[in-house]
Amino acid sequence: MTAFKQGDPTTLNRLYGRSIGKPLRTHQQHLVDNLLPQISPPAEGPVTAERLFGEDCPLHFEIGFGGGEHLVYRADLLPNHGFIGAEPFLNGVASCLSQVEEQRLANIRIHNGDALEVLDRVPDGALTMLYLLHPDPWPKNKHAKRRMMNDGPVKMFADKLKPGGEFRFGTDHPVYLRHALMVMRRHTDAFEWVVEGPSDWQNRPSGWPETRYEHKARTKFGHEVWYFRFRRR
C-alpha cells in the first residue's frame, strides 16, 4: 500500500474543506443512519469485488461523487459491475443514498470520507475504471498540494487500474486544467491519452452524464467543461 508522508506535496493524506452544509432532512438522516452502514466498504482490510459484492466483477471507483448523479447513472447502466464511491461531504452522500434507495441499486458501495484511504486498500490492478470529475480546484498556488491531481494520487491511480483500464477526469476550471495536464505529462509511462480528434476534450463522451455541478458551471457561470480519458498502459 502507499505510504503517505506528512508534508509531502506529491501526496494527499488529509481532507480539506467542509464535511456538511445545511442540516439533513429526516429521511436523509434515516438513510445515513441505516442504509449507509449496510453499503459502506469495510473499515479495515482489502477492498475487493468479492468482499463487497460476493463475486468477481468489474470494479469501478469514483473519487468525490458530489450528489451521486454520475455514480448512480453508471451503476444503473452497468448492473453487473461493482461501483465504489467516496465523498467527504455528508449532504452529497445523503443525496446519493436517496437515489440508491429509489432505484434499488445493489451494485454500489459508498464511503463517507477520504477516497484515498479506501483506494489504497484496493488490490493493485483490480479497477476497470476510475473517475475524478470536477474535483475542488484549489486555485491558489499555495494550495496546489491539496489538489487531487498530484503525482502521489496519480501514481496510486496507475497502480490500482488494470492494464487497459480507464481513468476519466473532468473539470471546468482552467487553472486545474493546466495543472492536471502538467501532472499527467509526467505519467505517460503509465497512461495514454485516449483521443480521436482535436475537439474530443470539449465533448462529453458517451456514457458520461451531465451532473448538477457541471450543469451549474455551464448555465450559471458560463464555464467551459473539459473531458479526459486516459487508458492504463
From Swiss-Prot:
Gene Ontology MF annotations: tRNA (guanine(46)-N7)-methyltransferase activity
Binding positions (substrate): K140, D172, T211, R212, Y213, E214
Domain of life: Bacteria
Gene3D superfamilies, per the entry: Vaccinia Virus protein VP39
Record key words, sorted: Methyltransferase, S-adenosyl-L-methionine, Transferase, tRNA processing
Pathway terms, separated by semicolons: tRNA modification; N(7)-methylguanine-tRNA biosynthesis
Function summary: Catalyzes the formation of N(7)-methylguanine at position 46 (m7G46) in tRNA.
HAMAP family in alphabetical order: tRNA_methyltr_TrmB
Family recorded in the similarity comment: Belongs to the class I-like SAM-binding methyltransferase superfamily. TrmB family.
Name of the protein in its database record: tRNA (guanine-N(7)-)-methyltransferase
UniProt organism field: Erythrobacter litoralis (strain HTCC2594)
